[in-house]
Amino acid sequence: MTEAAAQPAEKAKSPNAPTEETVLSVKHYTDRMFAFRITRPGAFRFRSGEFVMIGLEGPNGKPLLRAYSIASPSWDEELEFFSIKVQDGPLTSKLQLIQPGDKVLLGRKSVGTLVHDALTPGKRLYLFSTGTGIAPFASIIRDPDTYERFEQVILTHTCRQVGELKYGQDLVAALKDDPLVGEHAHRLTHYTTVTREPWHNQKRITTCMEDGQLYSDLGVPPLNPATDRVMVCGSLDMLTDIKALCEKAGLKEGSNADPGEFVIEKAFVG
Protein backbone atom coordinates (compact mmCIF):
# COMPACT_ATOMS: atom_id res chain seq x y z
CA MET A 1 0.00 0.00 0.00
CA THR A 2 1.38 3.38 -0.95
CA GLU A 3 1.53 6.33 1.43
CA ALA A 4 -1.09 8.12 -0.68
CA ALA A 5 -3.45 5.15 -0.48
CA ALA A 6 -3.05 4.96 3.27
CA GLN A 7 -3.82 8.62 3.81
CA PRO A 8 -7.64 8.34 4.18
CA ALA A 9 -7.24 5.69 6.89
CA GLU A 10 -4.75 7.86 8.74
CA LYS A 11 -7.17 10.79 8.62
CA ALA A 12 -9.91 8.64 10.06
CA LYS A 13 -7.72 7.94 13.09
CA SER A 14 -6.92 11.61 13.64
CA PRO A 15 -8.49 13.25 16.71
CA ASN A 16 -9.48 16.10 14.38
CA ALA A 17 -11.33 13.84 11.94
CA PRO A 18 -15.07 14.48 11.47
CA THR A 19 -17.48 12.59 13.70
CA GLU A 20 -20.17 10.36 12.23
CA GLU A 21 -23.67 11.58 13.13
CA THR A 22 -27.15 10.20 12.50
CA VAL A 23 -29.81 11.96 10.42
CA LEU A 24 -32.91 12.50 12.58
CA SER A 25 -35.28 14.23 10.15
CA VAL A 26 -35.38 15.66 6.63
CA LYS A 27 -37.86 18.16 5.14
CA HIS A 28 -37.88 19.23 1.49
CA TYR A 29 -39.29 22.73 0.95
CA THR A 30 -38.86 23.08 -2.82
CA ASP A 31 -36.94 21.37 -5.59
CA ARG A 32 -34.04 23.65 -4.64
CA MET A 33 -34.05 23.69 -0.81
CA PHE A 34 -34.29 21.25 2.08
CA ALA A 35 -33.59 21.15 5.81
CA PHE A 36 -32.35 18.33 7.99
CA ARG A 37 -31.48 17.63 11.61
CA ILE A 38 -28.72 15.38 12.96
CA THR A 39 -27.45 14.19 16.30
CA ARG A 40 -25.13 16.52 18.21
CA PRO A 41 -21.99 15.15 19.89
CA GLY A 42 -21.86 15.88 23.60
CA ALA A 43 -18.52 17.68 23.25
CA PHE A 44 -19.56 19.86 20.28
CA ARG A 45 -19.80 23.54 21.21
CA PHE A 46 -20.61 26.54 19.02
CA ARG A 47 -21.86 30.11 19.11
CA SER A 48 -25.18 30.82 17.43
CA GLY A 49 -24.46 32.04 13.88
CA GLU A 50 -21.32 29.97 13.27
CA PHE A 51 -20.74 27.38 10.55
CA VAL A 52 -19.14 23.94 10.51
CA MET A 53 -17.94 21.45 7.93
CA ILE A 54 -20.42 18.67 7.18
CA GLY A 55 -20.56 16.06 4.46
CA LEU A 56 -20.49 12.44 3.39
CA GLU A 57 -17.94 9.75 2.71
CA GLY A 58 -16.61 10.25 -0.80
CA PRO A 59 -14.74 8.01 -3.24
CA ASN A 60 -12.09 5.80 -1.65
CA GLY A 61 -13.41 6.68 1.80
CA LYS A 62 -12.17 10.26 1.66
CA PRO A 63 -14.61 12.70 3.34
CA LEU A 64 -16.42 15.11 1.01
CA LEU A 65 -17.06 18.18 3.17
CA ARG A 66 -18.55 21.64 2.75
CA ALA A 67 -19.12 24.58 5.09
CA TYR A 68 -22.70 24.84 6.37
CA SER A 69 -24.16 27.38 8.77
CA ILE A 70 -25.74 25.78 11.82
CA ALA A 71 -29.43 26.72 11.80
CA SER A 72 -30.21 25.50 15.31
CA PRO A 73 -29.41 27.69 18.35
CA SER A 74 -26.42 26.89 20.53
CA TRP A 75 -28.62 25.41 23.29
CA ASP A 76 -30.34 22.84 21.03
CA GLU A 77 -29.53 19.19 21.67
CA GLU A 78 -29.70 18.51 17.92
CA LEU A 79 -28.06 20.24 14.95
CA GLU A 80 -30.15 21.68 12.13
CA PHE A 81 -29.03 22.68 8.63
CA PHE A 82 -30.75 24.34 5.65
CA SER A 83 -29.28 23.43 2.28
CA ILE A 84 -29.63 24.24 -1.37
CA LYS A 85 -29.83 21.38 -3.88
CA VAL A 86 -27.29 21.40 -6.69
CA GLN A 87 -28.07 18.52 -9.03
CA ASP A 88 -24.50 18.12 -10.25
CA GLY A 89 -22.85 19.31 -7.03
CA PRO A 90 -20.21 16.92 -5.66
CA LEU A 91 -21.83 16.97 -2.21
CA THR A 92 -25.36 18.36 -2.44
CA SER A 93 -26.35 16.02 -5.27
CA LYS A 94 -25.91 13.20 -2.73
CA LEU A 95 -26.78 15.06 0.47
CA GLN A 96 -30.28 15.88 -0.79
CA LEU A 97 -31.03 12.14 -0.86
CA ILE A 98 -30.37 11.49 2.84
CA GLN A 99 -33.07 9.87 4.97
CA PRO A 100 -33.55 9.51 8.75
CA GLY A 101 -31.12 6.92 10.03
CA ASP A 102 -28.42 7.72 7.46
CA LYS A 103 -24.98 8.91 8.54
CA VAL A 104 -23.35 12.27 7.82
CA LEU A 105 -19.95 13.62 8.77
CA LEU A 106 -19.60 16.58 11.13
CA GLY A 107 -16.46 18.66 11.62
CA ARG A 108 -15.25 19.14 15.17
CA LYS A 109 -14.79 22.91 15.13
CA SER A 110 -17.22 25.72 14.30
CA VAL A 111 -16.16 29.21 13.20
CA GLY A 112 -17.68 32.34 11.67
CA THR A 113 -18.20 36.09 11.89
CA LEU A 114 -22.00 36.18 12.21
CA VAL A 115 -21.85 36.19 16.00
CA HIS A 116 -22.76 38.73 18.65
CA ASP A 117 -19.13 38.97 19.75
CA ALA A 118 -18.27 40.62 16.41
CA LEU A 119 -20.73 43.49 16.95
CA THR A 120 -20.67 46.42 19.34
CA PRO A 121 -23.80 47.03 21.49
CA GLY A 122 -26.80 48.56 19.71
CA LYS A 123 -30.56 49.01 19.80
CA ARG A 124 -31.70 47.32 16.59
CA LEU A 125 -30.28 44.22 14.86
CA TYR A 126 -30.81 43.72 11.13
CA LEU A 127 -30.34 40.20 9.73
CA PHE A 128 -30.20 40.40 5.91
CA SER A 129 -30.39 37.07 4.06
CA THR A 130 -31.00 35.54 0.65
CA GLY A 131 -31.84 31.89 -0.05
CA THR A 132 -30.23 29.44 2.35
CA GLY A 133 -28.31 32.38 3.83
CA ILE A 134 -31.12 32.56 6.38
CA ALA A 135 -29.61 29.53 8.17
CA PRO A 136 -27.29 31.33 10.64
CA PHE A 137 -30.12 33.72 11.48
CA ALA A 138 -32.43 30.79 12.21
CA SER A 139 -29.92 30.10 14.98
CA ILE A 140 -29.60 33.70 16.14
CA ILE A 141 -33.33 34.49 16.42
CA ARG A 142 -33.78 31.43 18.65
CA ASP A 143 -30.96 32.45 20.99
CA PRO A 144 -32.06 34.27 24.20
CA ASP A 145 -28.82 36.27 24.15
CA THR A 146 -30.05 38.06 21.00
CA TYR A 147 -32.96 39.61 22.88
CA GLU A 148 -30.80 40.53 25.84
CA ARG A 149 -28.52 42.52 23.53
CA PHE A 150 -31.09 44.16 21.24
CA GLU A 151 -34.50 45.77 21.69
CA GLN A 152 -35.62 44.97 18.14
CA VAL A 153 -34.60 42.29 15.63
CA ILE A 154 -35.42 42.60 11.91
CA LEU A 155 -34.97 39.47 9.78
CA THR A 156 -35.15 40.00 6.02
CA HIS A 157 -35.29 37.07 3.61
CA THR A 158 -35.12 37.44 -0.17
CA CYS A 159 -35.65 34.45 -2.47
CA ARG A 160 -36.22 33.83 -6.16
CA GLN A 161 -39.59 32.12 -5.66
CA VAL A 162 -42.37 32.41 -3.09
CA GLY A 163 -42.09 28.75 -2.04
CA GLU A 164 -38.49 29.31 -0.97
CA LEU A 165 -39.68 31.64 1.81
CA LYS A 166 -41.45 28.75 3.58
CA TYR A 167 -38.54 27.73 5.82
CA GLY A 168 -38.27 31.21 7.29
CA GLN A 169 -42.04 31.61 7.56
CA ASP A 170 -42.37 28.35 9.51
CA LEU A 171 -39.46 29.33 11.71
CA VAL A 172 -40.90 32.71 12.66
CA ALA A 173 -44.42 31.31 13.15
CA ALA A 174 -43.11 28.77 15.66
CA LEU A 175 -41.09 31.33 17.59
CA LYS A 176 -43.98 32.39 19.83
CA ASP A 177 -44.13 28.85 21.22
CA ASP A 178 -40.37 28.56 21.74
CA PRO A 179 -39.69 27.73 25.42
CA LEU A 180 -36.69 30.07 25.68
CA VAL A 181 -37.51 33.04 23.42
CA GLY A 182 -41.27 32.85 22.94
CA GLU A 183 -41.86 35.81 25.24
CA HIS A 184 -39.64 37.93 22.96
CA ALA A 185 -41.24 36.86 19.65
CA HIS A 186 -43.08 40.19 19.33
CA ARG A 187 -39.72 41.95 19.11
CA LEU A 188 -38.84 40.13 15.88
CA THR A 189 -40.01 41.48 12.52
CA HIS A 190 -39.88 39.22 9.46
CA TYR A 191 -39.60 41.09 6.12
CA THR A 192 -39.71 39.10 2.88
CA THR A 193 -39.12 39.89 -0.79
CA VAL A 194 -39.21 37.76 -3.95
CA THR A 195 -37.32 38.49 -7.17
CA ARG A 196 -38.62 36.10 -9.86
CA GLU A 197 -42.31 35.52 -9.11
CA PRO A 198 -45.32 37.78 -8.53
CA TRP A 199 -45.41 38.79 -4.85
CA HIS A 200 -46.64 41.76 -2.88
CA ASN A 201 -43.00 42.75 -2.46
CA GLN A 202 -41.30 41.73 -5.71
CA LYS A 203 -37.89 43.39 -5.59
CA ARG A 204 -34.40 42.99 -4.21
CA ILE A 205 -33.86 43.89 -0.56
CA THR A 206 -31.10 46.29 -1.57
CA THR A 207 -33.58 48.18 -3.75
CA CYS A 208 -35.93 48.38 -0.75
CA MET A 209 -33.08 49.91 1.24
CA GLU A 210 -32.03 52.35 -1.46
CA ASP A 211 -35.51 53.68 -2.20
CA GLY A 212 -36.47 53.79 1.48
CA GLN A 213 -39.33 51.28 1.23
CA LEU A 214 -37.80 48.95 3.84
CA TYR A 215 -37.67 51.67 6.46
CA SER A 216 -41.09 53.13 5.68
CA ASP A 217 -42.68 49.67 5.73
CA LEU A 218 -41.10 48.96 9.12
CA GLY A 219 -41.63 52.41 10.55
CA VAL A 220 -37.98 52.85 11.45
CA PRO A 221 -35.35 55.41 10.40
CA PRO A 222 -32.61 54.53 7.86
CA LEU A 223 -29.45 52.78 9.03
CA ASN A 224 -27.70 54.69 11.80
CA PRO A 225 -24.37 53.66 13.34
CA ALA A 226 -25.51 54.98 16.72
CA THR A 227 -28.37 52.49 17.00
CA ASP A 228 -28.24 49.84 14.27
CA ARG A 229 -26.21 46.67 13.89
CA VAL A 230 -26.21 44.49 10.79
CA MET A 231 -25.42 40.87 9.87
CA VAL A 232 -25.46 39.72 6.25
CA CYS A 233 -25.45 36.23 4.70
CA GLY A 234 -26.40 35.15 1.19
CA SER A 235 -25.50 35.80 -2.42
CA LEU A 236 -22.23 37.49 -3.29
CA ASP A 237 -24.04 40.38 -5.01
CA MET A 238 -26.18 41.02 -1.94
CA LEU A 239 -23.17 40.89 0.38
CA THR A 240 -21.30 43.39 -1.77
CA ASP A 241 -24.24 45.77 -2.13
CA ILE A 242 -25.29 45.78 1.53
CA LYS A 243 -21.69 46.23 2.64
CA ALA A 244 -21.54 49.35 0.47
CA LEU A 245 -24.86 50.61 1.86
CA CYS A 246 -23.68 50.03 5.43
CA GLU A 247 -20.43 51.89 4.82
CA LYS A 248 -22.31 54.72 3.12
CA ALA A 249 -24.47 55.02 6.24
CA GLY A 250 -21.34 55.25 8.40
CA LEU A 251 -21.31 51.73 9.82
CA LYS A 252 -17.92 50.10 10.42
CA GLU A 253 -17.30 46.45 9.54
CA GLY A 254 -16.51 44.27 12.54
CA SER A 255 -14.85 40.95 13.28
CA ASN A 256 -14.28 38.65 16.22
CA ALA A 257 -11.02 40.46 16.94
CA ASP A 258 -12.36 43.97 16.33
CA PRO A 259 -16.14 44.35 16.84
CA GLY A 260 -18.00 46.85 14.67
CA GLU A 261 -21.46 47.87 13.48
CA PHE A 262 -21.88 45.28 10.70
CA VAL A 263 -20.52 41.86 9.75
CA ILE A 264 -20.78 39.65 6.67
CA GLU A 265 -20.02 35.96 6.23
CA LYS A 266 -17.24 35.68 3.66
CA ALA A 267 -16.63 31.95 3.95
CA PHE A 268 -19.32 30.97 1.45
CA VAL A 269 -22.38 32.25 -0.36
CA GLY A 270 -25.83 30.67 -0.13
What is each PLM-predicted segment?
Residues 130-136:
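Ser/Thr-glycine-rich phosphate-binding loops at phosphate-binding pockets of nucleotides
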Residues 119-124, 225-226:
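Short helix-loop-beta connector
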Residues 110-120:
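A short, basic/flexible loop-to-alpha-helix module at the beginning of a structural domain
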Residues 49, 133, 235:
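Short, conserved phosphate/pyrophosphate- and ester-handling motifs at nucleotide-, phospho-/glycolipid
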Residues 2, 7-102:
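Ferredoxin-reductase
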Residues 125-128, 231:
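Conserved beta-strand elements of the Class I
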Residues 136-148:
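Histidine-anchored nucleotide/phosphate-binding helix
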Residues 3-8, 13-19, 156-157, 161-270:
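Reductase modules of NAD(P)H-dependent flavoproteins
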